[in-house]
Curated annotation (Swiss-Prot):
UniProt name for this protein: DNA-directed RNA polymerase subunit omega
GO CC entries: DNA-directed RNA polymerase complex
InterPro entries in the cross-refs: DNA-dir_RNA_pol_omega (IPR003716), Pol_omega/Rpo6/RPB6 (IPR006110), RPB6/omega-like_sf (IPR036161)
Higher taxonomy: Bacteria, Pseudomonadati, Pseudomonadota, Gammaproteobacteria, Chromatiales
GO terms assigned for molecular function: DNA binding; DNA-directed RNA polymerase activity
Organism: Thioalkalivibrio sulfidiphilus (strain HL-EbGR7)
Coiled coil regions in record: none
Subunit structure of this chain's protein: The RNAP catalytic core consists of 2 alpha, 1 beta, 1 beta' and 1 omega subunit. When a sigma factor is associated with the core the holoenzyme is formed, which can initiate transcription.
Enzyme's top EC category: transferase
NCBIfam families: rpoZ
Catalytic activity: RNA(n) + a ribonucleoside 5'-triphosphate = RNA(n+1) + diphosphate
Pfam families: RNA_pol_Rpb6
Record GO biological process: DNA-templated transcription
Length: 87
């Protein structure tokens, strides 16, 4: 396993801040069971996410994806009015 550097990933990202957001979201997806797009090689999800970015398999588009679980979590929140009615 070769070490992944920020410079390896920045060739496919606009800036470091975007890189952090994309890597974090992709690592979260991998932790939740999404299939890696590169060989796992016994790496942690964060390293796999960075390798995917460096290889060009994952880009900014991952930020635009709305996962069903995320949507369900937002839609299932109790409204403030419902809480007040309970009190």
């Amino acid at each position: 396993m070769a070490r992944i550097t920020v410079e390896d990933c920045l060739t496919n990202m606009d800036n470091r801040f975007q890189l952090v957001l994309v890597a974090a979201k992709r690592a979260r997806q991998l932790s939740m069971g999404h299939q890696p797009r590169v060989a796992e090689e016994n790496d942690k999800p964060t390293v796999i996410a960075l390798r995917e970015i460096a290889d060009g398999h994952v880009g900014r588009e991952v930020l635009d994806e709305v996962v069903a679980e995320e949507h369900a979590a937002v839609s299932s929140r109790i409204s403030e009015d419902e809480v007040r009615a309970e009190l």
